[in-house]
Amino acid sequence: HALVRDDSHTDELSGLGVNVILGDATSEEDIKNFISGVKESGEIHAILHCVGSFAVRPPHAMNKEAFEAVISTNLTSAFLTLSIAGKAMLSQGHGRMVFMSSVAGSLGLVNHEAISAAKGGIESMVRSAAATYANRGLRINAVAPGLTDTKLASPIMSNETASQAASQKIPVKRVGRKEEVANVIKWLLTEAPENFTGQILHTDGGMSNVLV
């Protein structure tokens, strides 16, 4: 099952056997309806909150509305997912949740103040929620990619100069591939040890922890 706002990949997902529901991750009602629909098919074993936005702008060039939009899209939607899906999982006594953070959540990057606040909030929330629900069967983690070759990063990836400059800041000297991030998410949702919770896995080519 997938709740998506952009219907451009609906046919592709449906072809893979995914039940696609159009909705907005910032809408409490949409998430409640989605979770209720999924529960009709059985237990909810795993939830992925895969939401992001591209907002590279210094604070003096960003107004209150733009900042709040970044927080709503990323952090508020994550809380709603945690709250609503978490409640469904608590009634089962088990479940795994993964949230999308970013290297900006733990590393000071130029002009990333808004997204850093949002993703840093997600990481803190994940750690706290992992503690809250550890003895109730829920395992809650996050994945924090660096620059990855996705549609969201197209403003950088489509500019050769910007792409090369970004790559030079990464210890492995290349941007990430979406398949690499997907593999980590799959592991967390299906194969990670039962005692693995409250962790932030950085798929950023070493950027957040390695100096070369």
Please name every model-derived segment:
Residues 58-59, 66-71, 166:
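Substrate-binding pocket helix/loop in short-chain dehydrogenase/reductase
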Residues 60, 107-113, 135-136, 173, ...:
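Active-site loop immediately N-terminal to the catalytic Tyr-X3-Lys motif
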Residues 82, 118, 126:
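Active-site helix of classical SDR
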Residues 87, 131-132, 194:
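Alpha-helical segment proximal to the catalytic Tyr-Lys
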Residues 102:
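Residue(s) in the substrate-gating loop at a strand-loop-helix junction
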Residues 107, 186, 197-212:
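Short C-terminal tail/terminal secondary-structure segment
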Residues 134, 139, 196-198:
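Short, small/polar-rich loop/turn modules that mediate ligand/substrate recognition or access, typified
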